Amino acid sequence: MINSSKIIIIGGGIVGCSTAYHLADLGHEVCLIESGKLTSGSTWHAAGLVGQLRSNANITQLLGYSVDLYNRLEEETGLSTGWKMNGGLRLACNEQRWK
């Protein structure tokens, strides 16, 4: 597969996996190389939180896309993502943030 692929991605963290997924979705033949288990490095140690509201509209839209993708990824690929929709609570740490 490496010899026939025009795109080779090294690293199976969230960025490598996402890049491979989106390029393959566009019809490219992609080979992803990972020395261990997918997402088992730095990606695994991250909190995995996907908050949906930010102060910037573009980032909020990107996070919304991420939530939609995680909701359908397991069905599309047949691979378990471990995605769970949980709530969250943000507290104002001072009076200015409260306003």
Language model features: what each stretch is:
Residues 10, 34, 46, 85-87:
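A secondary-structure boundary/capping signal
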